[in-house]
């Protein structure tokens, strides 16, 4: 079956293609009474929006979201929320050269083999343009989580190529176009992007996303563990090739005496687990990292084949991001918010009223 939906109680279904008429989504399960407006959603959409800086694609889309249903007099009604964003800056002619060719490193070949037909304009459904609707839906989840439970979800670019941050200042993230929390690395990121543009090449990136004030108890063992669903959601983001929860792959070189998060009446002694044990939230910060590959949409010639299986070469035309990780920051926030929101509603539905004698630390 088609995989266009995520979540069970808070369910998001998206539709639309990169060069289609519009993008849209349906959000089911949002509790009634939440004050929400298009302006609330637009804030995060503007952070993801293309054409806002010289470091990202110059496709200029206003990404103005319209709320079509599920909101009355400024509040959610508990019914399906319909959202729509019209595409306004398509340049389909930029992709005429790849109509019968497969871009190496993209979904062209696999979509063609799976469906027997593909929308070659900007990648069609496989384009990261689709993630605009995830961000819009995630903004609803973020507002509910923050307003009702004090849960805050934030992310930042922690590495681009070989340039990695040394410190995290949350106040700096929105002060630069890289969502970088280390002001001393902004210039290095800038230089890297300028060099890549001269070379016609691209680079990978790493993003950390954190949820704070998450209640203890979220997650549904065994198959719907919280960390499993987070990994699923983050892995579904375009270009993501790796997901870590907590210390992630660093645990390979750790000993049990180092990795275990000891407990005391004052709380946990560390957070190597990333806020999740046994697939259930501990009440600590949920910490995840994602690795994004360098986009293959570059002007460096590459070998490929056409639809007849014949060898050919391809130089990608169009407007593309030298580092897709930059605009993926609000997308990572949105996907984590959707998962936490879904699990919070699921937990409340089954375990509301559950209490123990053990104090929460």
UniProtKB/Swiss-Prot annotation:
Its cofactor is FMNH2. Reduced FMN (FMNH(2)). Pfam families: Chorismate_synt. One of its GO terms (biological process) is chorismate biosynthetic process. CDD domains: Chorismate_synthase. GO terms for cellular component: cytosol. Keywords: Amino-acid biosynthesis, Aromatic amino acid biosynthesis, FAD, Flavoprotein, FMN, Lyase, NADP. Its EC number is 4.2.3.5. One of its GO terms (molecular function) is FMN binding. NCBIfam families: aroC (TIGR00033), PRK05382.1 (NF003793). PANTHER family: CHORISMATE SYNTHASE. Belongs to the chorismate synthase family. This is Chorismate synthase. It comes from Vibrio vulnificus (strain YJ016).
């Amino acid at each position: 079956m088609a995989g266009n939906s995520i979540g069970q109680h808070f369910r998001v279904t998206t539709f639309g293609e990169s060069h289609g008429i519009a993008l849209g989504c349906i959000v089911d399960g949002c509790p009634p009474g939440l004050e929400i407006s298009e302006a609330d959603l637009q804030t995060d959409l503007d952070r993801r929006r293309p054409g806002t800086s010289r470091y990202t694609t110059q496709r200029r889309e206003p990404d103005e979201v319209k709320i079509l249903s599920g909101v009355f007099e400024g509040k959610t009604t508990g019914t399906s929320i319909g959202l729509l964003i019209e595409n306004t800056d398509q340049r389909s002619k930029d992709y005429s050269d790849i109509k019968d060719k497969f871009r190496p490193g993209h979904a062209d070949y696999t979509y063609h083999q799976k469906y027997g037909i593909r929308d070659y304009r900007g990648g069609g459904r496989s384009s990261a343009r689709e993630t605009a609707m995830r961000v819009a839906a995630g903004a609803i989840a973020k507002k509910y989580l923050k307003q009702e439970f004090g849960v805050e979800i934030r992310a930042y670019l922690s590495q681009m190529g070989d340039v990695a941050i040394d410190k995290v200042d949350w106040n700096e993230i929105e002060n630069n176009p890289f969502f970088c929390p280390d002001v001393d690395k902004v210039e290095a990121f800038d230089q890297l992007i300028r060099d890549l543009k001269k070379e016609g090449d691209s680079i990978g990136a790493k993003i950390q996303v954190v949820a704070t004030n998450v209640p203890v108890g979220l997650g549904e063992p065994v198959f719907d563990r919280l960390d499993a669903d987070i990994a699923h959601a983050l892995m579904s983001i375009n270009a993501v090739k790796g997901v870590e929860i907590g210390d992630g792959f660093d645990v390979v070189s750790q000993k049990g005496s180092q990795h275990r998060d000891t407990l005391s009446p004052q709380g946990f002694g560390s957070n190597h687990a990333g806020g999740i044990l046994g697939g259930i939230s501990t009440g600590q910060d949920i910490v995840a990292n994602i690795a994004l590959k360098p986009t293959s949409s570059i002007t460096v010639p590459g070998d490929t084949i056409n639809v007849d299986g014949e060898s050919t070469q391809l130089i990608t035309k169009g407007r593309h991001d030298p580092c897709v990780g930059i605009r993926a920051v609000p997308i990572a926030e949105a996907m984590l918010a959707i998962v936490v929101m879904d699990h919070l509603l699921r937990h409340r539905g089954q375990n509301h009223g559950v209490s123990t004698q053990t104090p929460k630390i």
